[in-house]
Amino acid sequence: MSNDSTTAKLGCVIALAAAWAVAPPAAAAAPLDAVVEQLVLEAEAANLELAGAEQGVAQRLAVLDQARARFLPALDLGMRYSMADGGRQIDIPVGDLLNPVYASLNSLLAASGQPAPFTPIDNVSVPFLREEELQAVVSLTQPVYDARIPAAKRAAEHEYIASRQGLDALRVRLRRDMQQAWFRWLALRESAAVLDASLEAARENQRVNESLHRNGRVTRDLVLRAEADVLEIEQQLEATNGAQRIARNYVNLLRNQPLEAPLPEAAVSDADVARRRDALVRQAGGVARDRGWLQDTAVERRQELRQIDSGIEAAGAAEDLARAAFRPQLALAVDAGVQSEELGFEGDENFVLASLVLRFNFYNGGADRAALREARARSGELLAARDLAEQHVRLEVLESVKDFEVAEASLRTAAKRVAAADGAFGIARRKRDLGQIAQVEFIDARRAVTSAQLNQQVNRFQALSALAAVEYAVGGPVRSAPPPETGP
């Protein structure tokens, strides 16, 4: 084997490997947008955190139903049948009181020749407990005035609305997290493909140098250098494959699938970044780079802020609830039933009792005033949290837009870097074929191509992840066109 033919063969192998590394994914891969929407829908349907939040909304709705029910009358049925033996006796001295009177009357009547009609009577002893007693009562209670009831209803309504807005905010965050997790997995997959191609080329270079060394054409240092090059790429590939598995596990965690389940693939290019950027610009009415408008839009659309707003309204209702303790409560109560010594619902034992019940608390140790202070402090806490959250949202918009601009610029630079590295590698390959370049310089040229390709893959998916962050920062996908731009 001649040195020229061997190096020419090596050049062909490395060139083919480099071409394979930068080749686009297979045509069978699905379009990017379709796969993104598929994964988002799967996550929204099965994500465990989202399912828990939905149950939280159902809980707040049940609390609201309870608050509404307090406006309606309460109807209760109570029945009691008792048997008693013994117990206290109530002694009534009827005989002691009336018998002397009866005796005097009988004497007067006898003196006038009339019969004595009055007979002595015994004292009466009444048992405190009846031997048998049946009591059945139907009670109807209707609040007439109670300031606590409407205040509690308003608080429950706003808490329910806040829980729904929190659920919507979680959906938007889940959409961002799913996109970014999947883009990270794609980036690692593409990086592994580049490293695989580079590893094959490095192994071929090692085999060629070992053959040349056996034939006495090169020294041992070139063989060791080629071996070190292979080991370096293997180490990088092992780390990349491990990170790829972790990224896949996280995507499957978000969509509640087995962690090792395969993920859908998609063909991704720089054109996809530009297309998704333009789509976001169109959704924003052509003012996606207007940071002021984006900040105002985010403040208007972010469900986290709406959730805090509803919490503030609920805290205001809680203040009204605390103030209601200083007002009277008036209720209507109607009881209808029977109290009898025998089983049955007939006779004179039936009764109906209607009452207006007024309750007003004058003093309970200052607990009501403390509850009012607590409610006011809660309102103040939420107002401060609302201002802080709005500042965070505005800052998040600025950071996400800036991150995308940096990623977009880096992507353009990465494309130029790949072109420059490819050109330099082509020149190095021709010099190598002419025997005008050292082996170490040729390996460095190959490394430059690999590094440029890896950098391009990373920047491409970083740009897509940054776009997902911008979409999240402004409140998710814009469903309707915004007002026309008025700022500069």
What are these regions (language model features)?
Residues 3, 165, 169-297, 400-403, ...:
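Periplasmic alpha-helical coiled-coil/stalk elements that build and connect Gram-negative outer-membrane
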Residues 30-32, 78-138, 269-287, 320, ...:
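Small/polar, glycine/serine/threonine/aspartate-rich low-complexity segments that form flexible
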Residues 38, 133-135, 180, 225, ...:
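Transmembrane beta-barrel architecture of outer-membrane proteins
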Residues 40, 52-67, 170, 174-195, ...:
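Amphipathic alpha-helical coiled-coil segments
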Residues 41-51, 58-75, 121-130, 137-155, ...:
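A glycine-/polar-enriched beta->alpha junction
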